[in-house]
Amino acid sequence: VRPLVVPAAVLLALTGLTGGAHAADKPVKRTAQCQGDWIPGTPTADDVMKGEVSLVGLPPVKLGKKINWDASPYKNRSWEYVFHSLRWMGTLVVAYENSGDDKFLERAKEITADWWRHNKPGASKPYVWKDHPVSLRTQALVCLSMHVDDPWLKDSLSAHAKLLSTPSLYKKGHNHGIDQDIALMAIGCRYKRSDWSKLAVRRLTETVKLDVDSQGALREQAPRYAVYVYGRLQVAMTNMRECGIKVPGDIAGRAESLKDFIAHSTQPNGYMAPLGDGSAETEPKMETGTPAQEVKVYRSGYAYGRTEWGKPDSAYYSIRFGPGMKYHGHEDHLGVTYYAQGRDILVDAGFHSYERSKYRYWTMSHEAHNVPTVVGARFRPRTASRLVDSSLGKDRQAYELTDQAYGVSRTRKVLVNHGEDIMAVRDGAAGGKKVRNIWRFADSLTLVSNKGGVVVLGDGKFKVALVQLSSSCRPLTGQKVERGGKLGWVSPTYLSRKPATVVVSPAAADVLTIVVPGVEDPKVSCSGGKVTVHTADGAVSFSANLI
């Protein structure tokens, strides 16, 4: 790869800017480019001054005075790109603005100048100049430029702007594109390059309309990224106002609509449903307000429901369908999660990391989710699925979904009853094919018993039962239960891997699964096309067809 050469004609409009870091007259002016929530919580400015950085939650690394820019102490891709984003350097500039102490600015300048000497475009590792590190690094460089006028910094920002404005490198309809536009606009506003600022606003408007649909759902297939996108759009709109640019209505409107989506994607315990590349430890630290409805179906592929808002012991579920897997999505179509009586019941395997490992790719697979599989048929990745019917009552909701991910129509019907908590699921496939389904329970729940088509799990006094019936309403026996092994794993936090109990049904033409929280010995009966289940709070009856 040839090093990027920036011709003089492309350089920033640098009229009259000369000199280096200067001793500040206290107090130092605090700038909009440096203040804000873009600075990471770790490392602190004092940590950086000591030559020690802690990134992406991993243990601190001693960088020393002379930094090795090829360092990769954990062989972790996220660590590498955050290292080269230089946001940790930005903590020094913020400390300088807040304290007036020149030592912070001098070290920030020293670090950044050294980085630029060793990491010219085309002369460093390719990931250093990929779209996201470039975008995030720009914020730190623009912040530094508010106090350092050296030509090398202007050259660096010009190189960043050239990449950020290159059409073939732009990630349209994705959170990376949003960050690219924020970065390009920051440079354009800093140096009065209206061509860059206008390009950034035009692209951002188009990207936001692609990334956030008209209902407010994020299309990246991992709801936790909606929190990130919402925060970044607040930054973008603030920067526009600071730059004298009118905020387009489409950007403001779509950003506001994300609040309801984030609220519906958040479980009663305050943590987001860990769908796609979403960790179970994601807690939206933002005010979303309380949506008017307890149940919401998003055309982009989500159905959410809960008993009521504001109560941690409310029941809650998620159901996935929609466009085939892309961006931060997993092969979770027709999958469900379930939370009841103040705890997780059914969970996905979760998000482990972005490392290229077998385990990472397994967590994205259909086997890592609560889905039906078609026996003897090959799974076809990235297949879209459809919600074909729904019945949305206050205390009971039912859904019917279908796709051809196995080359034949597979169908899942889901019924959730609130108050007397149950989730009932009916799975089948066309063409006489048999199905087998997978149920992954929260890692705190361990096997108590497995007999007669009833699997009971528990955590201390709390019990939950899984009952499986055939199309004739007879017990379906022969469940396989494993903890660990091939299927029995979850990743509740970043880079963690814990054993969890997984129940795999026997193969059958039609499988009715009933999950009953809070019950150890559920009584289930069938009569006249209806199924009656005795829960901890009373009996529940529903059509054997569910919908």
Task: Mark where each language-model region is.
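Short, cationic motifs built from Arg/Lys/His that form the positively charged side of catalytic pockets
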Residues: R137, R306, T411-V414
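Asp/Glu-centered strand-loop micro-motifs enriched in Gly/Pro and often flanked by an aromatic residue
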Residues: L55-V82, V93-N98
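Carbohydrate-active enzyme catalytic cores, enriched for enzymes
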Residues: M185, D213-V347, F351, G393, ...
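CBM-like, beta-strand-rich accessory domains located in the C-terminal region of large
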Residues: R77, K154, H352-I547
